[in-house]
Every structure is written in structure tokens, then in C-alpha cells.
Amino acid sequence: MNKVFPFVVIVATVLILVFDTTDAKGEKKCSNSEECVKFCSEYSDVHPACIGDHCECIRWEGGISI
């Protein structure tokens, strides 16, 4: 068990990083939120935002947003 656990953690970390990198390839690069409006227009009830260096389409799931 002590020798297998570090291997499992390393493999899981590598898989997460590979998936995250693959998923990010489809994202639109941006420098401000206005560049993301067209990218997010295919979704309904979302707020376009430039987070980091790529567009995110944030969905409000109820509640009060200030």
C-alpha cells in the first residue's frame, strides 16, 4: 500500500493535467470581457467574462448577484 499510493497520486495528477490542457485548447483567448460576448452568445443566461487569458461563460444559478 505504501508503495502503490504515491504512484496512484502521480498518475491521477498527470491525467488531470492532460485533461485540463486538452479542454483549454477549445477556449478563446481574450484580454477583456467584451471579446467574449460572441463566444458566449451560443449559450442562454450566461455572463461573458475574461478570466486569466481566456473566455468563460458564467451561468447564474439563482440567488442574488451583486
Swiss-Prot record:
Q: Which residues form the signal peptide?
A: 1-24
Sorted alphabetically, which keywords does the UniProt record give? Disulfide bond, Ion channel impairing toxin, Neurotoxin, Potassium channel impairing toxin, Secreted, Signal, Toxin, Voltage-gated potassium channel impairing toxin
Location(s) in or outside the cell: Secreted
Q: Which GO terms describe its cellular component?
A: extracellular region
The membrane spanning regions, by residue number, are: none
GO MF term set: potassium channel regulator activity; toxin activity
Tissue-by-tissue expression: Expressed by the venom gland.
Among its keywords, does the record have rRNA-binding? no
- Disulfide pairings: 30-50, 36-55, 40-57
The answer to whether the entry has keyword Signal is yes
Remaining remarks: Negative results: does not block Kv7.1/KCNQ1 channels.
Q: What is known of its domains?
A: Has the structural arrangement of an alpha-helix connected to antiparallel beta-sheets by disulfide bonds (CS-alpha/beta).
UniProt function note: inhibits Kv1.3/KCNA3 channel.
| Recorded family membership | Belongs to the short scorpion toxin superfamily. Potassium channel inhibitor family. Alpha-KTx 30 subfamily.
Name of the protein in its database record: Potassium channel toxin alpha-KTx 30.2
Q: Which species is this record about?
A: Scorpiops jendeki (Scorpion)
Q: What is the lineage of its organism?
A: Eukaryota, Metazoa, Ecdysozoa, Arthropoda, Chelicerata
